[in-house]
């Protein structure tokens, strides 16, 4: 059975969708006060949290992550709102085993504000992308994408909600395609 870990920095809504359908070995957050940790507790999922500032440098921070991943024999790391750029230490240890979800149709609107950037650009549609993580920012090879239209009477809140709904469908589809067993 493939073991997965989820990395998230904040709310953890994508983590919750994943954890309700798939066995998650653990969730990691780079913020000790992130709501994702409460979600994990409620779902009975093991959680870890530590912050970059607790380490001498990013290489040491990522070495601690690699140690966790190896200790739990993780096969696939699912980034779900993890707002740190994966650096060379983690990438070298887990290249080809880290995926990310991005709330835009890449290569359009990479970076931390995909939904807002798409909205402000006035595009007719944006979407959701799951891709392999590489050394760039949202530049890895696309695994799967889905388009989300911007409706005539949309507010940014409605548009964002539809993008999140698309995310909640796409991550399980990708995990199924990788042969991750469901609960």
Predicted segments — roles?
Residues 21, 83-182:
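Donor/substrate-binding cores of folate-linked one-carbon enzymes
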Residues 2-38:
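N-terminal beta1-alpha1 ligand-phosphate binding loop
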Residues 23-64:
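Short, surface-exposed acidic-centric catalytic microdomains
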Residues 29-30, 58, 72-88:
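N-terminal glycine-rich "phosphate-gripper" loop used for MgATP/nucleotide binding
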């Amino acid at each position: 059975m493939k073991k997965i870990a989820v990395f998230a920095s904040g709310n953890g809504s994508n983590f919750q969708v994943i954890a309700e359908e798939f066995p998650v070995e653990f969730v990691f957050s780079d913020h000790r006060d992130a709501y994702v940790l409460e979600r994990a507790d409620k779902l009975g999922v093991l959680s870890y949290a530590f912050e970059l500032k607790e380490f001498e440098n990013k290489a040491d921070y990522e070495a601690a992550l690699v140690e966790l991943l190896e200790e739990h024999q993780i096969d696939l790391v699912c980034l779900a709102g993890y707002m740190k750029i994966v650096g060379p230490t983690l990438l070298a240890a887990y290249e080809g085993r880290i995926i990310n979800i991005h709330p835009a149709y890449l290569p359009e609107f990479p970076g931390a504000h995909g939904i807002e950037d798409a909205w402000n650009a006035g595009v007719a549609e944006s979407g959701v992308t799951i891709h392999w993580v590489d050394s760039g920012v949202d530049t890895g090879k696309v695994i799967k994408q889905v388009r989300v239209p911007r409706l005539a009477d949309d507010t940014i809140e409605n548009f964002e909600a539809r993008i999140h709904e698309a995310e909640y469908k796409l991550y399980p589809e990708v995990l199924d395609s990788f042969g991750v067993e469901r609960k």
